[in-house]
Protein backbone atom coordinates (compact mmCIF):
# COMPACT_ATOMS: atom_id res chain seq x y z
CA UNK A 1 0.00 0.00 0.00
CA UNK A 2 2.74 2.45 0.96
CA UNK A 3 5.33 1.00 -1.42
CA UNK A 4 3.96 2.71 -4.53
CA UNK A 5 3.91 6.31 -3.23
CA UNK A 6 7.33 5.90 -1.60
CA UNK A 7 8.83 4.41 -4.75
CA UNK A 8 7.40 7.22 -6.87
CA UNK A 9 8.62 10.10 -4.70
CA UNK A 10 12.08 8.60 -4.03
CA UNK A 11 12.68 7.87 -7.73
CA UNK A 12 11.55 11.35 -8.74
CA UNK A 13 13.72 13.06 -6.12
CA UNK A 14 16.79 11.12 -7.24
CA UNK A 15 16.22 11.97 -10.92
CA UNK A 16 15.30 15.62 -10.30
CA UNK A 17 18.80 16.76 -9.32
CA UNK A 18 20.70 15.82 -12.51
CA UNK A 19 17.71 16.75 -14.65
CA UNK A 20 17.34 20.12 -12.92
CA UNK A 21 20.98 20.90 -13.66
CA UNK A 22 20.39 19.95 -17.28
CA UNK A 23 17.43 22.35 -17.47
CA UNK A 24 19.55 25.18 -16.01
CA UNK A 25 22.23 24.37 -18.60
CA UNK A 26 19.61 24.72 -21.34
CA UNK A 27 18.01 27.93 -20.12
CA UNK A 28 21.35 29.65 -19.57
CA UNK A 29 22.33 28.84 -23.16
CA UNK A 30 25.44 26.86 -22.21
CA UNK A 31 24.66 23.93 -24.52
CA UNK A 32 26.12 23.25 -27.98
CA UNK A 33 23.14 22.68 -30.25
CA UNK A 34 23.54 21.05 -33.69
CA UNK A 35 24.03 23.55 -36.50
CA UNK A 36 20.53 23.47 -37.98
CA UNK A 37 18.87 23.76 -34.56
CA UNK A 38 21.17 26.65 -33.67
CA UNK A 39 20.27 28.35 -36.96
CA UNK A 40 16.53 28.20 -36.14
CA UNK A 41 17.16 29.45 -32.61
CA UNK A 42 19.10 32.42 -33.94
CA UNK A 43 16.23 33.30 -36.28
CA UNK A 44 13.81 33.28 -33.32
CA UNK A 45 16.04 35.52 -31.22
CA UNK A 46 14.61 39.03 -31.66
CA UNK A 47 16.98 40.44 -29.05
CA UNK A 48 16.89 40.92 -25.27
CA UNK A 49 13.49 41.84 -23.83
CA UNK A 50 12.56 43.76 -20.71
CA UNK A 51 9.64 42.48 -18.65
CA UNK A 52 6.99 44.39 -20.62
CA UNK A 53 8.33 43.17 -23.96
CA UNK A 54 8.50 39.62 -22.60
CA UNK A 55 4.87 39.76 -21.43
CA UNK A 56 3.69 41.26 -24.73
CA UNK A 57 5.43 38.48 -26.67
CA UNK A 58 3.84 35.89 -24.37
CA UNK A 59 0.36 37.36 -24.84
CA UNK A 60 0.76 37.65 -28.62
CA UNK A 61 1.82 34.01 -28.83
CA UNK A 62 -1.18 32.90 -26.77
CA UNK A 63 -3.56 35.06 -28.80
CA UNK A 64 -2.40 33.39 -32.00
CA UNK A 65 -2.74 29.98 -30.34
CA UNK A 66 -6.34 30.82 -29.41
CA UNK A 67 -7.25 31.94 -32.94
CA UNK A 68 -5.68 28.90 -34.60
CA UNK A 69 -7.19 26.49 -32.06
CA UNK A 70 -10.66 27.99 -32.42
CA UNK A 71 -10.43 27.69 -36.21
CA UNK A 72 -9.33 24.04 -36.06
CA UNK A 73 -12.16 22.96 -33.76
CA UNK A 74 -14.80 24.95 -35.64
CA UNK A 75 -13.69 23.38 -38.93
CA UNK A 76 -13.18 19.88 -37.50
CA UNK A 77 -15.82 18.24 -39.69
CA UNK A 78 -14.11 19.58 -42.84
CA UNK A 79 -10.52 18.69 -41.96
CA UNK A 80 -8.63 15.45 -42.75
CA UNK A 81 -7.77 12.62 -40.33
CA UNK A 82 -11.39 12.24 -39.31
CA UNK A 83 -12.10 8.54 -39.97
CA UNK A 84 -14.97 8.44 -37.48
CA UNK A 85 -16.71 11.52 -38.95
CA UNK A 86 -16.65 13.70 -35.86
CA UNK A 87 -18.83 16.79 -36.15
CA UNK A 88 -18.47 20.34 -34.85
CA UNK A 89 -18.71 21.14 -31.15
CA UNK A 90 -21.01 23.87 -29.86
CA UNK A 91 -19.47 27.39 -29.92
CA UNK A 92 -19.35 27.65 -26.12
CA UNK A 93 -17.65 24.26 -25.86
CA UNK A 94 -15.12 25.31 -28.50
CA UNK A 95 -14.40 28.50 -26.52
CA UNK A 96 -14.00 26.53 -23.31
CA UNK A 97 -11.81 23.86 -24.91
CA UNK A 98 -9.47 26.30 -26.67
CA UNK A 99 -9.14 28.39 -23.52
CA UNK A 100 -8.57 25.26 -21.46
CA UNK A 101 -5.69 23.89 -23.52
CA UNK A 102 -4.14 27.30 -24.23
CA UNK A 103 -3.91 27.95 -20.47
CA UNK A 104 -2.48 24.49 -19.67
CA UNK A 105 -5.67 23.63 -17.76
CA UNK A 106 -7.10 20.85 -19.95
CA UNK A 107 -10.55 21.07 -18.37
CA UNK A 108 -12.69 18.92 -20.66
CA UNK A 109 -16.40 19.63 -21.13
CA UNK A 110 -16.38 17.00 -23.88
CA UNK A 111 -15.21 13.40 -24.25
CA UNK A 112 -12.08 13.13 -26.38
CA UNK A 113 -12.85 9.71 -27.83
CA UNK A 114 -16.40 10.77 -28.76
CA UNK A 115 -16.06 14.37 -29.93
CA UNK A 116 -12.59 15.01 -31.43
CA UNK A 117 -11.00 13.83 -34.67
CA UNK A 118 -7.41 12.63 -34.96
CA UNK A 119 -6.51 15.93 -36.63
CA UNK A 120 -7.89 17.91 -33.69
CA UNK A 121 -6.05 15.65 -31.26
CA UNK A 122 -2.72 16.12 -33.06
CA UNK A 123 -3.03 19.60 -34.61
CA UNK A 124 -4.70 21.28 -31.64
CA UNK A 125 -4.44 19.21 -28.45
CA UNK A 126 -0.86 17.93 -28.87
CA UNK A 127 0.49 21.30 -30.06
CA UNK A 128 -1.02 23.13 -27.10
CA UNK A 129 0.20 20.53 -24.65
CA UNK A 130 3.76 21.38 -25.67
CA UNK A 131 3.42 25.15 -25.95
CA UNK A 132 1.15 25.90 -22.97
CA UNK A 133 3.46 23.94 -20.67
CA UNK A 134 6.47 25.73 -22.12
CA UNK A 135 4.91 29.14 -21.36
CA UNK A 136 4.98 28.50 -17.61
CA UNK A 137 8.54 27.20 -17.88
CA UNK A 138 9.59 30.36 -19.74
CA UNK A 139 7.95 32.60 -17.14
CA UNK A 140 9.96 30.96 -14.36
CA UNK A 141 13.20 31.37 -16.35
CA UNK A 142 12.44 35.06 -16.92
CA UNK A 143 11.71 35.61 -13.22
CA UNK A 144 14.96 33.90 -12.22
CA UNK A 145 16.89 36.25 -14.50
CA UNK A 146 15.17 39.18 -12.82
CA UNK A 147 15.97 37.89 -9.34
CA UNK A 148 19.66 37.55 -10.18
CA UNK A 149 19.66 41.11 -11.59
CA UNK A 150 20.34 40.28 -15.22
CA UNK A 151 20.16 43.25 -17.58
CA UNK A 152 17.12 41.71 -19.32
CA UNK A 153 14.49 38.99 -18.82
CA UNK A 154 15.62 36.93 -21.81
CA UNK A 155 13.75 36.40 -25.06
CA UNK A 156 10.37 34.67 -24.96
CA UNK A 157 10.58 33.03 -28.40
CA UNK A 158 14.10 31.77 -27.78
CA UNK A 159 13.08 30.40 -24.40
CA UNK A 160 10.09 28.61 -25.95
CA UNK A 161 12.37 26.94 -28.48
CA UNK A 162 14.80 25.81 -25.81
CA UNK A 163 12.09 24.32 -23.60
CA UNK A 164 10.17 22.51 -26.34
CA UNK A 165 13.08 21.25 -28.45
CA UNK A 166 15.76 20.52 -25.85
CA UNK A 167 13.59 19.47 -22.89
CA UNK A 168 10.08 18.30 -23.80
CA UNK A 169 10.58 16.55 -27.14
CA UNK A 170 13.56 14.31 -26.19
CA UNK A 171 11.93 13.09 -22.97
CA UNK A 172 8.55 12.65 -24.71
CA UNK A 173 10.11 10.47 -27.41
CA UNK A 174 11.72 8.18 -24.85
CA UNK A 175 8.55 7.93 -22.79
CA UNK A 176 6.44 7.38 -25.91
CA UNK A 177 8.49 4.33 -26.88
CA UNK A 178 8.26 2.90 -23.35
CA UNK A 179 4.50 3.39 -23.24
CA UNK A 180 3.95 1.89 -26.70
CA UNK A 181 5.92 -1.15 -25.59
CA UNK A 182 3.54 -1.42 -22.63
CA UNK A 183 0.42 -1.42 -24.80
CA UNK A 184 -0.55 2.13 -25.73
CA UNK A 185 -1.85 2.29 -29.34
CA UNK A 186 -0.35 4.58 -31.97
CA UNK A 187 -2.43 4.63 -35.14
CA UNK A 188 -4.42 6.99 -37.33
CA UNK A 189 -7.05 4.34 -38.06
CA UNK A 190 -10.64 4.84 -36.98
CA UNK A 191 -12.70 2.69 -34.65
CA UNK A 192 -12.10 -1.05 -34.70
CA UNK A 193 -15.18 -3.26 -35.08
CA UNK A 194 -14.97 -6.47 -33.05
CA UNK A 195 -17.34 -9.30 -32.23
CA UNK A 196 -17.80 -9.83 -28.52
CA UNK A 197 -17.31 -13.22 -26.89
CA UNK A 198 -20.79 -12.99 -25.44
CA UNK A 199 -23.26 -12.66 -28.30
CA UNK A 200 -25.54 -9.68 -27.89
CA UNK A 201 -23.45 -8.06 -25.15
CA UNK A 202 -23.68 -4.74 -27.03
CA UNK A 203 -27.39 -5.13 -27.69
CA UNK A 204 -29.17 -6.08 -30.87
CA UNK A 205 -29.99 -4.24 -34.08
CA UNK A 206 -33.61 -3.78 -35.31
CA UNK A 207 -33.16 -6.86 -37.51
CA UNK A 208 -32.32 -8.95 -34.45
CA UNK A 209 -28.61 -9.34 -35.19
CA UNK A 210 -26.16 -8.67 -32.33
CA UNK A 211 -24.37 -5.32 -32.44
CA UNK A 212 -20.57 -5.41 -32.73
CA UNK A 213 -18.40 -3.56 -30.26
CA UNK A 214 -16.73 -0.40 -31.59
CA UNK A 215 -13.33 0.26 -29.99
CA UNK A 216 -11.96 3.78 -30.33
CA UNK A 217 -8.26 4.06 -31.13
CA UNK A 218 -5.89 6.70 -32.41
CA UNK A 219 -2.49 8.38 -31.89
CA UNK A 220 -2.63 7.84 -28.13
CA UNK A 221 1.08 7.20 -27.55
CA UNK A 222 1.99 10.51 -29.23
CA UNK A 223 -0.10 12.48 -26.74
CA UNK A 224 0.34 10.64 -23.44
CA UNK A 225 4.00 11.53 -22.68
CA UNK A 226 3.59 15.32 -22.97
CA UNK A 227 0.15 15.08 -21.39
CA UNK A 228 1.94 14.25 -18.15
CA UNK A 229 5.40 15.76 -18.65
CA UNK A 230 3.73 19.10 -19.35
CA UNK A 231 1.30 18.67 -16.42
CA UNK A 232 -1.51 19.00 -18.96
CA UNK A 233 -3.86 16.17 -18.02
CA UNK A 234 -6.37 16.21 -20.88
CA UNK A 235 -7.32 12.67 -21.86
CA UNK A 236 -7.57 11.17 -25.33
CA UNK A 237 -10.40 9.10 -23.83
CA UNK A 238 -13.19 10.27 -21.60
CA UNK A 239 -12.02 7.92 -18.83
CA UNK A 240 -8.59 9.60 -18.96
CA UNK A 241 -5.78 7.57 -17.38
CA UNK A 242 -8.23 5.01 -16.02
CA UNK A 243 -8.70 3.81 -19.63
CA UNK A 244 -6.60 0.73 -20.52
CA UNK A 245 -5.37 2.35 -23.75
CA UNK A 246 -4.06 5.40 -21.88
CA UNK A 247 -2.74 3.51 -18.87
CA UNK A 248 -2.53 -0.22 -19.58
CA UNK A 249 -0.63 -1.61 -16.57
CA UNK A 250 0.82 -0.86 -13.15
CA UNK A 251 4.15 -0.17 -14.91
CA UNK A 252 2.61 2.49 -17.16
CA UNK A 253 0.92 3.95 -14.07
CA UNK A 254 4.31 4.25 -12.36
CA UNK A 255 5.83 5.89 -15.46
CA UNK A 256 2.86 8.26 -15.61
CA UNK A 257 3.35 9.36 -12.00
CA UNK A 258 7.06 9.83 -12.66
CA UNK A 259 6.28 11.91 -15.75
CA UNK A 260 3.93 14.15 -13.79
CA UNK A 261 6.41 14.90 -11.01
CA UNK A 262 9.79 15.04 -12.74
CA UNK A 263 9.65 18.52 -14.26
CA UNK A 264 8.09 20.36 -11.27
CA UNK A 265 10.71 18.94 -8.89
CA UNK A 266 13.54 19.53 -11.35
CA UNK A 267 12.54 23.16 -11.80
CA UNK A 268 13.23 23.81 -8.10
CA UNK A 269 16.75 22.49 -8.65
CA UNK A 270 17.03 24.62 -11.80
CA UNK A 271 16.00 27.64 -9.71
CA UNK A 272 18.84 27.01 -7.26
CA UNK A 273 21.44 26.36 -9.95
CA UNK A 274 20.56 29.46 -12.00
CA UNK A 275 20.55 31.66 -8.86
CA UNK A 276 23.70 29.96 -7.54
CA UNK A 277 21.86 29.50 -4.24
CA UNK A 278 21.14 25.81 -3.80
CA UNK A 279 20.67 26.10 -0.03
CA UNK A 280 17.71 28.42 -0.55
CA UNK A 281 16.30 26.13 -3.26
CA UNK A 282 16.58 23.13 -0.93
CA UNK A 283 14.51 24.95 1.71
CA UNK A 284 11.77 25.42 -0.90
CA UNK A 285 12.20 21.82 -2.10
CA UNK A 286 11.84 20.51 1.47
CA UNK A 287 8.74 22.58 2.26
CA UNK A 288 7.02 21.48 -0.95
CA UNK A 289 7.93 17.83 -0.36
CA UNK A 290 6.68 17.95 3.23
CA UNK A 291 3.31 19.33 2.08
CA UNK A 292 3.07 16.75 -0.70
CA UNK A 293 3.81 13.83 1.63
CA UNK A 294 1.17 15.10 4.05
CA UNK A 295 -1.38 15.26 1.21
CA UNK A 296 -0.52 11.76 -0.04
CA UNK A 297 -0.68 10.20 3.43
CA UNK A 298 -3.99 11.94 4.18
CA UNK A 299 -5.47 10.77 0.86
CA UNK A 300 -4.39 7.15 1.32
CA UNK A 301 -5.46 7.06 4.97
CA UNK A 302 -8.98 8.37 4.39
CA UNK A 303 -9.64 6.47 1.15
CA UNK A 304 -7.60 3.27 1.04
CA UNK A 305 -7.70 2.53 4.78
CA UNK A 306 -11.36 3.47 5.23
CA UNK A 307 -14.32 1.71 3.58
CA UNK A 308 -17.00 3.50 1.64
CA UNK A 309 -19.82 3.88 4.19
CA UNK A 310 -22.34 4.36 1.41
CA UNK A 311 -22.05 0.67 0.50
CA UNK A 312 -22.77 -0.91 3.86
CA UNK A 313 -23.67 1.55 6.59
CA UNK A 314 -27.19 2.66 5.66
CA UNK A 315 -30.26 1.41 3.90
CA UNK A 316 -31.74 3.11 0.89
CA UNK A 317 -33.48 6.41 1.52
CA UNK A 318 -35.52 8.57 -0.84
CA UNK A 319 -34.90 12.29 -1.29
CA UNK A 320 -36.46 15.10 -3.27
CA UNK A 321 -33.79 17.37 -4.73
CA UNK A 322 -34.01 20.59 -6.72
CA UNK A 323 -33.95 20.15 -10.49
CA UNK A 324 -35.30 22.99 -12.67
CA UNK A 325 -35.55 20.61 -15.65
CA UNK A 326 -37.85 18.14 -13.85
CA UNK A 327 -41.64 18.51 -13.57
CA UNK A 328 -42.42 20.72 -10.61
CA UNK A 329 -38.77 21.62 -10.21
CA UNK A 330 -38.04 18.49 -8.14
CA UNK A 331 -36.76 15.00 -8.86
CA UNK A 332 -36.71 11.96 -6.61
CA UNK A 333 -33.53 9.98 -6.03
CA UNK A 334 -32.45 7.10 -3.84
CA UNK A 335 -29.21 7.81 -2.03
CA UNK A 336 -27.02 5.89 -1.68
CA UNK A 337 -28.11 3.70 -4.59
CA UNK A 338 -26.19 0.55 -3.52
CA UNK A 339 -26.49 0.76 0.25
CA UNK A 340 -26.97 -2.45 2.16
CA UNK A 341 -25.19 -4.73 -0.30
CA UNK A 342 -22.95 -7.40 1.24
CA UNK A 343 -19.75 -5.86 -0.12
CA UNK A 344 -16.35 -6.80 1.32
CA UNK A 345 -14.28 -3.63 1.74
CA UNK A 346 -11.09 -4.97 3.28
CA UNK A 347 -9.15 -3.08 0.59
CA UNK A 348 -10.84 0.22 1.43
CA UNK A 349 -13.03 2.32 -0.81
CA UNK A 350 -12.96 0.63 -4.22
CA UNK A 351 -15.71 2.66 -5.89
CA UNK A 352 -14.36 4.29 -9.04
CA UNK A 353 -10.97 2.53 -8.80
CA UNK A 354 -8.94 0.48 -11.29
CA UNK A 355 -7.49 -2.44 -9.33
CA UNK A 356 -4.92 -3.27 -11.99
CA UNK A 357 -2.84 -0.38 -10.59
CA UNK A 358 -2.91 -1.50 -6.94
CA UNK A 359 -5.11 -0.63 -3.97
CA UNK A 360 -3.54 2.73 -3.07
CA UNK A 361 -2.86 3.88 -6.63
CA UNK A 362 -6.04 5.93 -6.97
CA UNK A 363 -5.53 7.94 -3.78
CA UNK A 364 -1.82 8.39 -4.56
CA UNK A 365 -2.52 9.55 -8.10
CA UNK A 366 -5.18 11.99 -6.84
CA UNK A 367 -2.61 13.64 -4.57
CA UNK A 368 0.04 13.77 -7.31
CA UNK A 369 -2.13 15.06 -10.13
CA UNK A 370 -3.52 17.96 -8.10
CA UNK A 371 -0.30 18.82 -6.27
CA UNK A 372 1.31 19.61 -9.63
CA UNK A 373 -1.83 20.91 -11.41
CA UNK A 374 -1.80 18.09 -13.95
CA UNK A 375 -5.46 17.04 -13.77
CA UNK A 376 -5.04 13.58 -15.23
CA UNK A 377 -6.96 10.95 -13.24
CA UNK A 378 -6.74 7.17 -12.88
CA UNK A 379 -9.76 6.92 -10.58
CA UNK A 380 -13.03 8.80 -10.18
CA UNK A 381 -12.37 11.70 -7.80
CA UNK A 382 -16.12 12.07 -7.33
CA UNK A 383 -16.07 8.64 -5.65
CA UNK A 384 -13.32 9.40 -3.15
CA UNK A 385 -14.40 9.31 0.48
CA UNK A 386 -15.30 12.88 1.55
CA UNK A 387 -12.19 13.61 3.61
CA UNK A 388 -9.98 12.03 0.95
CA UNK A 389 -11.63 14.38 -1.56
CA UNK A 390 -10.16 17.29 0.39
CA UNK A 391 -6.69 16.24 -0.79
CA UNK A 392 -7.08 17.13 -4.48
CA UNK A 393 -8.95 20.30 -3.52
CA UNK A 394 -6.15 21.35 -1.15
CA UNK A 395 -3.54 20.77 -3.82
CA UNK A 396 -5.45 23.08 -6.15
CA UNK A 397 -6.18 25.68 -3.47
CA UNK A 398 -2.52 26.02 -2.48
CA UNK A 399 -1.38 25.71 -6.11
CA UNK A 400 2.27 25.60 -5.07
CA UNK A 401 2.89 22.08 -3.74
CA UNK A 402 5.34 21.55 -6.61
CA UNK A 403 2.66 23.09 -8.80
CA UNK A 404 2.49 23.19 -12.59
CA UNK A 405 5.30 23.50 -15.09
CA UNK A 406 7.12 26.56 -13.79
CA UNK A 407 3.93 28.21 -12.54
CA UNK A 408 3.98 26.24 -9.28
CA UNK A 409 7.43 27.58 -8.49
CA UNK A 410 6.26 31.07 -9.48
CA UNK A 411 3.34 30.78 -7.04
CA UNK A 412 5.72 29.68 -4.30
CA UNK A 413 7.88 32.75 -4.99
CA UNK A 414 4.82 34.91 -4.29
CA UNK A 415 4.41 33.15 -0.94
CA UNK A 416 8.14 33.70 -0.35
CA UNK A 417 7.75 37.44 -0.81
CA UNK A 418 4.74 37.52 1.53
CA UNK A 419 6.57 35.37 4.09
CA UNK A 420 9.65 37.60 4.01
CA UNK A 421 7.45 40.67 4.42
CA UNK A 422 5.57 39.23 7.41
CA UNK A 423 8.80 38.08 9.06
CA UNK A 424 10.35 41.51 8.52
CA UNK A 425 7.39 43.19 10.18
CA UNK A 426 7.62 40.88 13.18
CA UNK A 427 11.28 41.73 13.85
CA UNK A 428 10.99 45.40 12.92
CA UNK A 429 13.28 45.33 9.87
CA UNK A 430 12.77 46.28 6.24
CA UNK A 431 11.97 42.98 4.51
CA UNK A 432 14.59 41.71 2.07
CA UNK A 433 14.64 38.87 -0.42
CA UNK A 434 17.91 37.77 -2.03
CA UNK A 435 19.50 41.05 -0.96
CA UNK A 436 16.75 43.27 -2.40
CA UNK A 437 14.35 45.32 -0.29
CA UNK A 438 10.71 44.27 -0.49
CA UNK A 439 8.64 47.45 -0.45
CA UNK A 440 5.12 48.65 -1.23
CA UNK A 441 5.21 48.00 -5.00
CA UNK A 442 6.41 44.42 -4.57
CA UNK A 443 3.79 43.68 -1.93
CA UNK A 444 0.97 45.07 -4.07
CA UNK A 445 2.04 42.87 -6.98
CA UNK A 446 2.43 39.84 -4.71
CA UNK A 447 -0.99 40.27 -3.13
CA UNK A 448 -2.63 40.76 -6.52
CA UNK A 449 -1.12 37.48 -7.71
CA UNK A 450 -2.08 35.76 -4.46
CA UNK A 451 -5.67 36.95 -4.06
CA UNK A 452 -6.89 36.49 -7.62
CA UNK A 453 -6.86 32.71 -7.08
CA UNK A 454 -9.33 32.49 -4.15
CA UNK A 455 -11.50 35.21 -5.69
CA UNK A 456 -11.81 33.21 -8.92
CA UNK A 457 -12.74 30.08 -6.95
CA UNK A 458 -15.00 31.29 -4.17
CA UNK A 459 -16.87 33.98 -6.10
CA UNK A 460 -18.17 31.79 -8.97
CA UNK A 461 -18.74 28.88 -6.56
CA UNK A 462 -21.05 31.01 -4.42
CA UNK A 463 -22.84 32.36 -7.49
CA UNK A 464 -23.46 28.95 -9.08
CA UNK A 465 -24.40 27.35 -5.75
CA UNK A 466 -27.08 30.02 -5.30
CA UNK A 467 -28.50 29.77 -8.83
CA UNK A 468 -30.08 27.04 -10.93
CA UNK A 469 -26.94 27.16 -13.12
CA UNK A 470 -25.18 25.15 -10.44
CA UNK A 471 -27.95 23.36 -8.56
CA UNK A 472 -29.53 22.16 -11.79
CA UNK A 473 -26.24 20.71 -13.02
CA UNK A 474 -25.25 18.63 -10.00
CA UNK A 475 -26.13 14.94 -9.87
CA UNK A 476 -25.92 14.81 -6.08
CA UNK A 477 -27.79 16.69 -3.36
CA UNK A 478 -26.49 18.64 -0.39
CA UNK A 479 -22.85 18.92 0.56
CA UNK A 480 -21.57 16.66 -2.18
CA UNK A 481 -23.32 18.70 -4.83
CA UNK A 482 -21.69 21.81 -3.38
CA UNK A 483 -18.32 20.02 -3.46
CA UNK A 484 -18.81 19.29 -7.17
CA UNK A 485 -19.32 23.00 -7.89
CA UNK A 486 -16.41 24.00 -5.64
CA UNK A 487 -14.11 21.44 -7.25
CA UNK A 488 -14.94 22.58 -10.78
CA UNK A 489 -13.99 26.20 -10.15
CA UNK A 490 -10.97 25.19 -8.06
CA UNK A 491 -9.78 23.11 -11.00
CA UNK A 492 -10.38 25.92 -13.49
CA UNK A 493 -8.61 28.55 -11.39
CA UNK A 494 -5.65 26.31 -10.55
CA UNK A 495 -5.22 25.40 -14.24
CA UNK A 496 -5.65 21.78 -13.17
CA UNK A 497 -8.44 20.36 -15.31
CA UNK A 498 -9.63 17.41 -13.23
CA UNK A 499 -13.19 17.26 -11.97
CA UNK A 500 -15.59 15.50 -9.65
CA UNK A 501 -17.48 14.87 -12.90
CA UNK A 502 -20.89 14.76 -11.31
CA UNK A 503 -21.82 17.91 -13.20
CA UNK A 504 -24.00 18.22 -16.28
CA UNK A 505 -21.58 20.50 -18.14
CA UNK A 506 -21.32 18.81 -21.57
CA UNK A 507 -23.17 20.27 -24.56
CA UNK A 508 -21.59 18.08 -27.23
CA UNK A 509 -21.99 18.82 -30.93
CA UNK A 510 -23.65 22.07 -31.92
CA UNK A 511 -26.72 20.23 -33.28
CA UNK A 512 -27.21 18.11 -30.15
CA UNK A 513 -30.94 17.97 -29.45
CA UNK A 514 -30.58 17.18 -25.74
CA UNK A 515 -27.53 18.94 -24.29
CA UNK A 516 -27.02 19.46 -20.57
CA UNK A 517 -29.30 22.48 -19.97
CA UNK A 518 -26.76 24.68 -18.18
CA UNK A 519 -23.64 23.58 -20.06
CA UNK A 520 -23.17 26.97 -21.85
CA UNK A 521 -23.10 28.69 -18.45
CA UNK A 522 -20.38 26.33 -17.24
CA UNK A 523 -18.43 26.67 -20.50
CA UNK A 524 -18.34 30.46 -20.35
CA UNK A 525 -17.83 30.81 -16.58
CA UNK A 526 -14.97 28.32 -16.31
CA UNK A 527 -13.44 29.67 -19.53
CA UNK A 528 -13.26 33.18 -18.07
CA UNK A 529 -11.91 31.85 -14.77
CA UNK A 530 -9.17 29.96 -16.63
CA UNK A 531 -8.11 33.05 -18.57
CA UNK A 532 -8.01 35.39 -15.59
CA UNK A 533 -6.37 32.85 -13.28
CA UNK A 534 -3.72 32.01 -15.84
CA UNK A 535 -2.39 35.36 -16.93
CA UNK A 536 -2.67 37.68 -13.92
CA UNK A 537 -0.72 35.28 -11.63
CA UNK A 538 2.12 34.92 -14.16
CA UNK A 539 2.32 38.54 -15.35
CA UNK A 540 2.44 40.13 -11.89
CA UNK A 541 5.39 38.00 -10.66
CA UNK A 542 7.34 38.95 -13.81
CA UNK A 543 6.73 42.61 -12.96
CA UNK A 544 7.69 41.88 -9.35
CA UNK A 545 10.98 40.25 -10.39
CA UNK A 546 11.74 43.19 -12.70
CA UNK A 547 11.08 45.59 -9.83
CA UNK A 548 13.52 43.71 -7.60
CA UNK A 549 16.08 43.55 -10.42
CA UNK A 550 16.15 47.35 -10.63
CA UNK A 551 17.12 47.69 -6.96
CA UNK A 552 20.61 47.78 -5.53
CA UNK A 553 21.88 44.88 -3.48
CA UNK A 554 21.92 45.53 0.25
CA UNK A 555 24.89 44.14 2.19
CA UNK A 556 24.33 41.02 4.26
CA UNK A 557 24.48 41.79 7.99
CA UNK A 558 23.89 39.97 11.26
CA UNK A 559 20.33 41.29 11.26
CA UNK A 560 19.48 40.08 7.76
CA UNK A 561 16.92 37.30 7.75
CA UNK A 562 18.39 34.21 6.17
CA UNK A 563 16.29 32.39 3.58
CA UNK A 564 18.40 29.23 3.49
CA UNK A 565 17.84 27.67 6.90
CA UNK A 566 15.26 25.59 8.75
CA UNK A 567 13.76 28.62 10.48
CA UNK A 568 12.82 30.21 7.18
CA UNK A 569 11.42 26.88 6.03
CA UNK A 570 8.91 26.99 8.88
CA UNK A 571 8.14 30.65 8.10
CA UNK A 572 7.41 29.70 4.49
CA UNK A 573 5.32 26.69 5.48
CA UNK A 574 3.31 28.79 7.91
CA UNK A 575 2.75 31.48 5.28
CA UNK A 576 1.42 28.95 2.77
CA UNK A 577 -0.89 27.30 5.28
CA UNK A 578 -2.13 30.44 7.03
CA UNK A 579 -2.43 32.76 4.04
CA UNK A 580 -3.31 30.15 1.43
CA UNK A 581 -5.19 27.28 3.06
CA UNK A 582 -7.26 29.19 5.62
CA UNK A 583 -8.93 31.20 2.86
CA UNK A 584 -10.73 28.04 1.79
CA UNK A 585 -11.57 26.58 5.21
CA UNK A 586 -15.22 27.78 5.23
CA UNK A 587 -15.81 26.29 1.78
CA UNK A 588 -14.20 23.00 2.86
CA UNK A 589 -16.48 22.88 5.90
CA UNK A 590 -19.58 23.41 3.76
CA UNK A 591 -18.50 20.71 1.31
CA UNK A 592 -16.46 17.61 2.15
CA UNK A 593 -16.31 18.13 5.94
CA UNK A 594 -20.09 18.53 6.20
CA UNK A 595 -20.53 15.49 3.98
CA UNK A 596 -18.27 13.44 6.24
CA UNK A 597 -20.03 14.57 9.43
CA UNK A 598 -23.56 14.71 8.04
CA UNK A 599 -26.39 12.23 8.64
CA UNK A 600 -25.88 10.66 5.23
CA UNK A 601 -22.66 8.99 4.09
CA UNK A 602 -22.80 10.98 0.85
CA UNK A 603 -24.81 13.99 -0.20
CA UNK A 604 -26.82 14.71 2.92
Positions of the model-derived regions?
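Alpha-helical transmembrane segments and their helix-start/interface "positive-inside/aromatic belt" motifs
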Residues: 3-6, 46-64, 155-173, 275-292, ...
Amino acid sequence: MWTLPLLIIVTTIVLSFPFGRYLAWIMDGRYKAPGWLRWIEERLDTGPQDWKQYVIALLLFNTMAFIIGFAILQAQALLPLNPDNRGTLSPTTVFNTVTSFMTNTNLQHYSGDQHLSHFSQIGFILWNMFTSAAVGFCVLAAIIRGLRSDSHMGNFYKDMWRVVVYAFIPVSLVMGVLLMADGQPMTFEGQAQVTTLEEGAMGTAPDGKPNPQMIVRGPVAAIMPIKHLGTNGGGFFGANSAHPYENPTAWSNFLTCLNILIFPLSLIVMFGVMLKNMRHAMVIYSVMTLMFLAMAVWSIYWDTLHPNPGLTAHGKQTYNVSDPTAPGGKRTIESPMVAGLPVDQELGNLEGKELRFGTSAGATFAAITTAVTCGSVNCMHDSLNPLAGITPMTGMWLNCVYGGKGVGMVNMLVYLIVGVFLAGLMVGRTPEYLGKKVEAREMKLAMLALLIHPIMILGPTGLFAALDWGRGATNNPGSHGFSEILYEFSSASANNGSGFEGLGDTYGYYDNQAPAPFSPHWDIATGLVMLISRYIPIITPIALAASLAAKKMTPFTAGTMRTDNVTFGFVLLGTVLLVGALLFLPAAVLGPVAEHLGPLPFGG
